[in-house]
């Protein structure tokens, strides 16, 4: 389990990250990220819906994601909150596949967001 200070725990925090965060799809997961407070540690939350499978499968996917995230969370900037959502394909993914997906998503989260050019109308 992640330490208490490294978890996105409340419904309001989940909603904040899910709605206003940057969204990155990588393999069988989607990672929502938002920069919250600068001083706090990076935090993670997990969403594994019923479409992934029955309760046993969902809990297995959640445990795998949590374990893969634990070692990678420190690579994110301080104050970053991420919400990791498993897609139905995650049920058949190995821990190594989930780890590679997390690496790819976290690389994108760490990179600066490209500037949008102003549209002329």
UniProtKB/Swiss-Prot annotation:
HAMAP family: RNase_P. GO terms for biological process: tRNA 5'-leader removal. One of its GO terms (molecular function) is 3'-tRNA processing endoribonuclease activity. Consists of a catalytic RNA component (M1 or rnpB) and a protein subunit. InterPro entries: Ribosomal_Su5_D2-typ_SF, Ribsml_uS5_D2-typ_fold_subgr, RNase_P, RNase_P_CS. Keywords: Endonuclease, Hydrolase, Nuclease, RNA-binding, tRNA processing. RNaseP catalyzes the removal of the 5'-leader sequence from pre-tRNA to produce the mature 5'-terminus. It can also cleave other RNA substrates such as 4.5S RNA. The protein component plays an auxiliary but essential role in vivo by binding to the 5'-leader sequence and broadening the substrate specificity of the ribozyme. One of its GO terms (cellular component) is ribonuclease P complex. SUPFAM superfamilies: Ribosomal protein S5 domain 2-like. The lineage of its organism: Bacteria, Bacillati, Actinomycetota, Actinomycetes, Frankiales. It is an enzyme of class 3 (hydrolase). It catalyses: Endonucleolytic cleavage of RNA, removing 5'-extranucleotides from tRNA precursor. This is Ribonuclease P protein component. It comes from the Bacteria. Residues 1-20, 91-121 are annotated as: Disordered. Its EC number is 3.1.26.5. The keyword Protein biosynthesis does not apply. Belongs to the RnpA family. Pfam families: Ribonuclease_P.
